């Protein structure tokens, strides 16, 4: 049978999602826990492989197994064997045609900035600290030129292995809650470091170092060296993966934590 799981994880203590030799990964920890519950070796496939330090509240994985367990056993049982910074949020038996990566039609990320002169110890690792205040409205306006299907070479990491820089951005919204700036972006897929590179350049607009029109210019240049430095991984979260309705994949409130849609100044699409 094929099982899908919703996964939440704090990426601070991991070298990314993907299993690697001699370093901790989210995939390895999850496969070990699932293999214990299934009494057989389990290999998982995820919707999106996040980088070192990046967290997830809406990751989706699937695996195949000969073991027959109630759905709640896959959730509660697996959680009992996971470290505290990884958790299963739901479990569901799915059709054989479902694939966590290839069945997905879109991925959604949120990047959290904390604008304050002094950094926070409690929030360390979960947000990116910015000692300057940012103009969220200008950042939002600047980001609208990125909507639609376009060449994102200017926001693509040099080591990106994708065959094409073209991606289709469905929405990009920038909102503020007090001292927090939230960049919310959804696309069919993302090139390597795309969200963090976009955020790094939006910060330049938010501080007033660059005009709103600069983002359009960057996009047209198709040159990564002209854009701003990559934003830190600390504030980035994979918050949702979108699938066709026929798979009936469970939905959870978009987070992380207190950052639900209804609390943001700008309604999210």
UniProtKB/Swiss-Prot annotation:
Its EC number is 5.4.99.12. Keywords: Isomerase, tRNA processing. One of its GO terms (biological process) is tRNA pseudouridine synthesis. It comes from the Bacteria. CDD domains: PseudoU_synth_EcTruA. Substrate binds at residue 109. InterPro entries: PsdUridine_synth_cat_dom_sf (IPR020103), PsdUridine_synth_TruA (IPR001406), PsdUridine_synth_TruA_a/b_dom (IPR020097), PsdUridine_synth_TruA_C (IPR020095), TruA/RsuA/RluB/E/F_N (IPR020094). One of its GO terms (molecular function) is pseudouridine synthase activity. It holds the Pfam family PseudoU_synth_1. It catalyses: uridine(38/39/40) in tRNA = pseudouridine(38/39/40) in tRNA. Formation of pseudouridine at positions 38, 39 and 40 in the anticodon stem and loop of transfer RNAs. Homodimer. Belongs to the tRNA pseudouridine synthase TruA family. This is tRNA pseudouridine synthase A. It comes from Haemophilus influenzae (strain ATCC 51907 / DSM 11121 / KW20 / Rd). The lineage of its organism: Bacteria, Pseudomonadati, Pseudomonadota, Gammaproteobacteria, Pasteurellales.
């Amino acid at each position: 049978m094929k099982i899908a799981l919703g996964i939440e994880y704090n990426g601070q203590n991991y070298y990314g999602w993907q299993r690697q030799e001699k370093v901790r990964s989210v995939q390895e920890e999850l496969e070990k826990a699932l293999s214990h519950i299934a009494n057989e070796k389990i290999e998982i496939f995820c919707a999106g492989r996040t980088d070192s330090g990046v967290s997830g509240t809406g990751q989706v994985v699937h695996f195949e197994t000969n073991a027959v367990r109630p759905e709640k056993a896959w959730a509660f049982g697996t959680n009992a064997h996971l470290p505290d910074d990884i958790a299963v949020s739901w479990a569901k038996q799915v059709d054989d045609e479902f694939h966590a990566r290839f069945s997905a039609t879109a991925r959604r990320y949120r990047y959290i900035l904390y604008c304050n002169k002094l950094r926070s110890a409690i929030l360390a690792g979960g947000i990116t600290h910015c000692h300057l205040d940012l103009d969220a409205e200008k950042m939002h306006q600047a980001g609208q030129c990125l909507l639609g299907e376009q060449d994102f070479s200017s926001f693509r990491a040099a080591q990106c292995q994708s065959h094409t820089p073209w991606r289709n951005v469905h929405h990009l919204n920038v909102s503020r809650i007090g001292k927090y700036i939230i960049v919310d972006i959804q696309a069919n897929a993302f090139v390597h470091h795309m969200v963090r590179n976009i955020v790094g350049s939006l910060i330049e607009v938010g501080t007033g170092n660059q005009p709103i029109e600069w983002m359009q210019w960057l996009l047209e240049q198709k040159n990564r060296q002209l854009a701003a430095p990559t934003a830190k991984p600390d504030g980035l979260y994979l918050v949702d993966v979108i699938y066709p309705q026929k798979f009936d994949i469970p939905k959870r409130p978009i987070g992380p934590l207190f950052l639900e849609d209804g609390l943001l100044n700008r309604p999210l699409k």
